[in-house]
Structure formats: C-alpha cells, structure tokens
Amino acid sequence: MIALIQRVRRAEVRVGDRVTGAIDAGLLALVCAERGDTDAVADKLLAKVLGYRVFSDAAGKMNLPVQNIDGAGRAGGLLLVSQFTLAADTNSGLRPSFTPAAPPDEGKRLFDYFVAAARAKHAIVETGEFGAEMQVSLVNDGPVTFWLQTRA
C-alpha cells in the first residue's frame, strides 16, 4: 500500500462543485492499494502516516507527527484521497500499466478500511470520494513530500 504525503498549510478536495473534504495545517495523503494488500498492510501504513515526523519542533527540526504539529498536542488535519495511479508500472513504453494496483472493489474496501481506522485514531480526518473525478487544491508547506510504502 502506498501513501504520498505532503505537508500542507491547507488543502481541499472537490467532486464537481461540492467540497468533500478540507483541512487547515496538516497532511494531504494520496493513498493507493496494491494487489495483495491486506488490512494488516493498511494498518502498518496508517501507523507510519500518523507517526511520520514531518512538522518542525521548536528547534526547527522535522521532529513532530501530524498528531502533534505544534509540540503542544494540537492535531493537524489529515486529508485522505484515493489515487490508484500511484501503483503504475512505468518501466516500459510511454503508457503506464495499472496492473500493480488493487482491483477497484478491493481498492475501495481497503481505502474505506484505511479511512475508518484513521478516524478511530486521529481527531481530524477528511476524505475525497473513491473512484470520482476529483479536483485537489493545496498550499504546500515547505514543500515537504514523502513516498511511504508498506508491504506484507
């Protein structure tokens, strides 16, 4: 399972003219399930997303997770957006292959599981809409972007 996380000042996702999720300071995570991923793999990735230290402490070092973005216990927002294209195989030719991505039904199940688990562990969780054409707007903070990937 893959998450491309970006530290943001704010971010929102729209489907058509409807905002489906919006956060202030926190993380935007583009999330993709790969073939063979399980709930355990999703749990492992979520622990990494929630614990990854990408926010600056008082000394200016990236030392704080989204659950404590100011060092005083304030949680940042977590905007989760499904994006199967992260699993693309780009090794041959000029057209990506999406064979490594989980099939749509399994991808949706794992994304929904990931969102539910995130909501159980984190105060501020917003989402896009699985399988929809979405427009994502964000203001990067840094920019700070990391590719996180977990496997069984």
From Swiss-Prot:
Assembly and oligomerization: Homodimer.
Catalysed reactions, as listed in the record: glycyl-tRNA(Ala) + H2O = tRNA(Ala) + glycine + H(+); a D-aminoacyl-tRNA + H2O = a tRNA + a D-alpha-amino acid + H(+)
Listed Gene3D superfamilies: D-tyrosyl-tRNA(Tyr) deacylase
Motif Gly-cisPro motif, important for rejection of L-amino acids in this chain: 142-143
CDD domains for the chain: Dtyr_deacylase (cd00563)
GO cellular component terms, A-Z: cytoplasm
Subcellular localization(s) per the UniProt record: Cytoplasm
Keywords assigned by UniProt, alphabetized: Cytoplasm, Hydrolase, RNA-binding, tRNA-binding
Classification lineage: Bacteria, Pseudomonadati, Pseudomonadota, Betaproteobacteria, Burkholderiales
Family the UniProt entry places it in: Belongs to the DTD family.
Name of this chain's protein: D-aminoacyl-tRNA deacylase
Domain text: A Gly-cisPro motif from one monomer fits into the active site of the other monomer to allow specific chiral rejection of L-amino acids.
Ranges that cross the membrane: none
UniProt-listed Pfam families: Tyr_Deacylase
Record GO biological process: D-amino acid catabolic process
Function in brief: An aminoacyl-tRNA editing enzyme that deacylates mischarged D-aminoacyl-tRNAs. Also deacylates mischarged glycyl-tRNA(Ala), protecting cells against glycine mischarging by AlaRS. Acts via tRNA-based rather than protein-based catalysis; rejects L-amino acids rather than detecting D-amino acids in the active site. By recycling D-aminoacyl-tRNA to D-amino acids and free tRNA molecules, this enzyme counteracts the toxicity associated with the formation of D-aminoacyl-tRNA entities in vivo and helps enforce protein L-homochirality.
GO MF annotations, alphabetized: D-tyrosyl-tRNA(Tyr) deacylase activity; Gly-tRNA(Ala) deacylase activity; Ser(Gly)-tRNA(Ala) hydrolase activity; tRNA binding
Catalytic activity, EC: 3.1.1.96
